[in-house]
Amino acid sequence: TVNNHVGSYRREIMVPASWNGKEIIAHFGSVTSNMYLWVNGKYVGYSEDSKLEAEFNLTPYLKPGQKNLIAFQVFRWCDGTYLEDQDFFRYSGVGRDCYLYARNPKQQIADIRVTPDLDAQYQNGSLAVNLTMKGKGTVELELLDAQNKAVTTQSLNASGKVSTTIEVSSPHKWTAETPYLYTLRATLKEGGKTIEVIPVKVGFRKIELKNAQILVNGQPVLFKGADRHEMDPDGGYVVSRERMIQDIQIMKKFNLNAVRTCHYPDDNFWYDLCDKYGIYVVAEANIESHGMGYGEETLAKNPSYKKAHLERNQRNVQRGFNHPSIIFWSLGNEAGYGPNFEAAYDWIKNEDPSRAVQYEQAGKNGKTDIFCPMYYNYEDCAKYSEDNSMQKPLIQCEYAHAMGNSQGGFKEYWDLIRKYPKYQGGFIWDFVDQSVRWTGKNGKMIYAYGGDFNKFDASDNNFCDNGLISPDRVPNPHMYEVGYYYQDIWTTPGDLSKGEIKVYNENFFRDLSAYYLEWEMLKGGKVVRSGRVDDLKVAPQQTSTIRLDLGETCQCTEWLLNVSYKLKNREGLLPAGHTVAKDQLTLNPYKAPSMDLKNVETTNIETKAPVVQDSDANYLIVEGCGFRTEFNRENGYLIKYEVNGQDMIKEGEALTPNFWRAPTDNDFGAGLQKKYAAWKNPEMKLTSLNQRMENKQVIVEAVYDMPTVSAKLNLTYVINNKGAIKVTQKMTADKNAKVSPMFRFGMQMPMPRYFENIEYYGRGPVENYIDRKGNADLAIYRQTVDEQFYSYIRPQENGTKSDIRWWKMLNEAGNGIEVVASAPFSASALHYTIESLDDGARKDQRHSPEVEEADLTNLCLDKVQMGLGCVNSWGTIALPEYQIPYGDYEFTFILTPVKHSIEIE
């Protein structure tokens, strides 16, 4: 084989003399892609399957009390590689712990299996215990509760295969909500002497398939999941225990209750954590062969690979059998469908009837207990859910592709899941961006992806970066949206005039007594009242009405009610006070301000209209008390806006129409950088620039022809006596023209960089968009421009805030401008130009830290910006209601100079 590189590993070790006479086993947790093992120069054996442990009996080869040489070879590729075609970095080498252990060679519990179950009323429990013995002896079985107190004991005279059942009255049940674990302690004795002790964690739970649903302990739970590769930005396949605990903590923090081990068995410690902290697991076998095709050529139909398909699934089940967190076995991923998978399904269902078995390629009618498609769109999900002939639960094994700035439209998936009983959730692709830490061109740290290392290796560029969190485990902005729609407590209005709210407990197994409710009333974005409710006894799947002492409101402004639910005590990895759910209700709706710009009048002083200087050949100048504006006669744009000696527009720049954004990964996947290209720099032919005086205000109107998009555009500026400017951007489309939609309709104004401070009343604090804003509460926020930029691994549109009531750009002294509009609008302010974040017609090998900041603050004001979408990243765009089709649009906003303006501290 060409370029089949080899890694050779050698280590000299001292085996304790006390191990003499014992059976010594070598454990290799994960070696990619295979290994040949020698001990003291003698060949021991061979193993493949990169993601399952290999164990070898080294007893005949080792010399206890002496130095011993362990040596093994690892090949880059082997025949098993055809079944390991996963989409991720293809590393080689040792990825998990390697160690030796010693046991009694004649007497041991060779295998122990526990199968928990509940009775038909889900009340009492039973634990089937199956032992495989080497030799014989007495095995004492002791079931301990979480406080290490004995619940029940049994004693068996054991040899060969032995089975028993332990009955437990009303045990604590294991679920992701209530991950209660018992410990079964199996002690092997001979003549009163303890030979070995094996503890096994036990969770009492029952998995059933009934009425087109999967039930856990009789309840049709919702799977709020993500797919997780084992990847670390520094260790690659080597993921530390601390990193795994961190991942579990993040999952619990953002309300994830399920994980799919894509696309191979994980480190055993991961399943231990899922057992302990409560995560439902889809345990997947290490099979993916999409490179070989899905038709007749698939390896799923190749008899030569039948044994490999079967063994990989058998070993996956055998090593994970005792974990209560494993609810589903998955036969593999993207590997076609055929007899090889059918044989694996049959074997698992016979070996372990206590769990569900799934496989995406089996579709609706093949051998799978779950219909688990990938990237089903909303319509297909609804259609399947309404089809009564389909009697398998719908749980997408991959959905809501989280590539770059994404997860727009995530709400709509969960609207369907909460509507249809058969649709029980899914697993977001995927949990963590899989890039590696690297040094970029300018010496800054970047996260490298495919193509960064050379131009000849197979690569899918940044398609490894589809995570809810960054490689170093910082939540990406879209993770906050997921955390919101995955939450388990929901608040809706009751009779708000009486302070009544309705609280729905979406949990299936626990009431809300572990939480307290905090509420805040906001008047015009500011908190004016607050309170707390400690007694929340809302039963699972029930709604209760709670009355809050809200007091009086008025119709004068917008009133909002924030409600959040927090832990009373530490729970698992989450601290006391952690917010598990929240909602924001409207008490009195927002009313947009009048766009009737008036002069500022002072008592006993005559109002002086602005002065127009119309004689300059290059500029139309409008001046007034403490301000000066200049319009370029060549293009009609406002190029100077000076107030109290301070320029609001950076020299050389202008306030200009804006229809473009730096394409997101989803935009690129749909080819929008080309399909929408007419809007990137549309030709703007100035046909007239006029000014007139009305009511002691100057009105400047610039009229444009936009031939490349078959439209007309009017920019109208009304300037009052203090330099406030009402801007109206009005576009009229040609109804007969066929022109693409646009990314946004608005304007951009590059300002001097020292406008570093932002205050706004809108959604925040993280970026949010028209189709991704459920998590972002309305409030008054004070932030810096530096804080607006989110360093997605590949540069793209970011930093936008939506539903803005007012927005201020301020310098350190609190001086600047305030923006209000005729309706809530979107805005962003970055130290980057749109052009600098835009790859152009095709993706380049670019990284956000390598993009140079501009010496300006680029303010974008939008009537609307297109949504982000999340169905996939290779063609499907945002829902129609979140698109901006070609048509007539009008956007009116007012720029008002402000001094010493600080709303909040």
What is the predicted role of each segment?
Residues 133-138, 508-515, 737-741:
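A short beta-turn/strand-edge loop motif at beta-sheet boundaries
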Residues 1-27, 78, 82-86, 91-94, ...:
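Extended carbohydrate-recognition surfaces in non-catalytic/accessory domains of CAZymes
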Residues 44-45, 64-102, 176-185, 562-590, ...:
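Glycine/proline-rich low-complexity spacer/linker segments in large multi-domain proteins
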Residues 63-65, 132-208, 554, 559-599, ...:
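Extended acidic/polar, glycine-enriched regions
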Residues 155-170, 525-556:
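Intrinsically disordered, low-complexity Pro/Gly/Ser/Thr-rich segments with frequent PxxP/GP/PP motifs
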Residues 79-82, 87, 103, 193-502, ...:
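Extended substrate-binding grooves/exosites of carbohydrate-active enzymes
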Residues 3-109, 134-136, 265, 280-282, ...:
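Accessory beta-strand-rich segments of carbohydrate-active enzymes
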Residues 76, 175, 549-556, 571, ...:
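Beta-strand/loop-rich accessory regions of lumenal/periplasmic or secreted enzymes
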